[in-house]
Amino acid sequence: LGALKDFKILGIPFFKGYSAPKIGFNESFSFIYEFGEHANNQQSDTLGREKLTKSNELYTSPYHVGSGLFYLDQYLGKNILEESLREFASSNGKEPFKSILENKSNKNLNWFFNDYISDREAFDLHIKNTLKNKTTTSITISEKNGRKLPFKLDFIKNDSIVKEQWYFHSGKDSTYKLKRGKYDYVAINSNRYLPEKNRHNN
């Protein structure tokens, strides 16, 4: 994604000084945020430096934003995020980052800007119910606080992902009918790209 150090991207002043390659975007950073969240120390990513605790300023918030950007990149696909970051950089931040993304994609982005980076409460998706027959598996998915967001359903066989499918959760309990196939089970965001409050029910 390139260096972001000179831009107040997403309206987050303290993002200056961090770069996407340095952050790394792997599951360890989601773990760092989740550790702070479980300790009830998490804060909104849009707060100014002076309002953040030192641990949130230095570790939790930057890694949370990094994980979120990577998750957003996976959701949008087609290099949309990378192209949008380059355009944002070339405009010296004059055009809102959200507007640039919306011009390149028709997908819902409110979940990211209104909830992910602005709300201190972590998402909490979980599989509420499963019903199987000979040809299909129906799963009901819920989000604890009724929030809307995209999620990736992973089809897993022998502990490896054999298929991935993106869905957009409406905020209400939703049932998805899946064809039975060559997989052992399904899981929500099994690669930990999206920080969550509780992963044991995914």
Predicted regions and their residues:
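Compositionally biased, low-hydrophobicity segments enriched in charged and small polar residues
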Residues: 79-91, 167, 173-177, 192-195
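Beta-strand-rich binding/interaction modules
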Residues: 109-110, 130-190
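Composition- and surface-driven signal marking solvent-exposed, interaction-prone regions
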Residues: 83-87, 152-155, 166-168, 199-202
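Short acidic/polar inter-strand loop motif in beta-rich domains
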Residues: 160, 190-201
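Hydrophobic alpha-helical and helix-loop surface patches within well-folded domains
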Residues: 1-140
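Extracellular acidic, Ser/Thr/Pro-rich low-complexity tracts
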Residues: 103-105, 143-145, 196
